[in-house]
Structures are given as C-alpha cells and as structure tokens.
C-alpha cells in the first residue's frame, strides 16, 4: 500500500513535482519473486493454499499481508533502493513484466523517494518493494472520457483500461 510511503516525505515528494509525458518502448523485466495472484477464494482452505504457495515461492516461513477491497487495475511492482524509486514493473505474466519506470515517475501520487532515516526508524530496509494496483477512480475515469470526447479521441471502455493506458 503506497499510501504508507507518504508518511516519509522528501524534497522530491510527489506533491511537489509536476507530471510529465509518458515515454514509449518497454523493456521486459523478470520479477525477483513472481507476482502471484489470488483467484476468488471461497474458503479458508483456498486462502491457506495461497499462503502456502507464497511462502514456497518466497522461501520465507512467515509472510505478512495487507488486504484491501478488490480494485480492478494494473498490477505493479515498485522497487526502492536507498529510499529512491529505481524501477516500476507491470505484473505481466507474473514472472516477467514491462519496465514502465519513466511513465510511473509522472504519476504524482507515487513517491520518487522516501527519507532513509525515517525508513530505518520504522524498521523498513532502505531497499524494499511495494506491490499493488494502478487504479483510476470512477470520477477521474468519467472526466477523462469527457476530455477524450471533446478532443475527438477514443473513449476508454472501463477504468482499468484507462489506468493501464496511463501507465503503458
């Protein structure tokens, strides 16, 4: 959940910079740990099976989770090293995704850097990964489609496609 990162502001914080134009051309990047997904789970056993697979893949005995309501967006991995955003990768097929770092750096709600002293104080290593969904709110989606119509552009079918288009 990247919202936690906003408690570690820097002079390069996202609310202090202007958005930029996304760039074209993406390089394939293999995820250090696969980005597995959870299909609908209707029982504790299905959820426990997911946990077992995550622990096997990660090589960890214990894994902490953060659960939120389901968002329909583009799954992303953000890698920070020494407190700086160094790579943003789409989920892709789960093993390999697309490096969309330049485009993600134009999204104002994504911190480009977090203060390492504050990370240390919170027990967070200087190098860490954040995984989540790039989403577009219904209101932003409707406003975007209105702009598309006025400019003679093509309307997006749904917020997920619009979010993916903004990142890619």
Q: What residue ranges belong to the model's regions?
A:
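RNA/tRNA-interacting regions in translation and RNA-turnover enzymes
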Residues: 7-168
């Amino acid at each position: 959940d990247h919202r936690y990162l906003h408690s570690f502001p820097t002079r390069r914080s996202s609310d202090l910079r202007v958005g930029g134009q996304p760039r074209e051309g993406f390089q394939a990047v293999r995820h250090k740990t696969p980005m597995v997904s959870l299909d609908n789970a209707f029982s504790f056993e299905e959820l426990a099976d997911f946990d077992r697979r995550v622990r096997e893949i990660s090589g960890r005995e214990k894994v902490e989770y953060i659960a939120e309501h389901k968002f329909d967006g583009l799954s992303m991995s953000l890698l920070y090293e020494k407190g700086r955003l160094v790579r943003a990768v789409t989920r892709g097929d789960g093993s390999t995704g697309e490096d969309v770092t330049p485009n993600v750096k134009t999204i104002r709600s994504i911190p480009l850097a977090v203060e390492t002293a504050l990370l240390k104080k919170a027990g967070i290593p200087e190098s860490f990964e954040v995984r989540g969904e790039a989403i577009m709110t219904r209101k932003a989606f409707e406003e975007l489609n209105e702009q598309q119509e006025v400019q003679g552009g093509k309307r997006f079918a749904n917020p997920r496609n619009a979010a993916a288009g903004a990142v890619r």
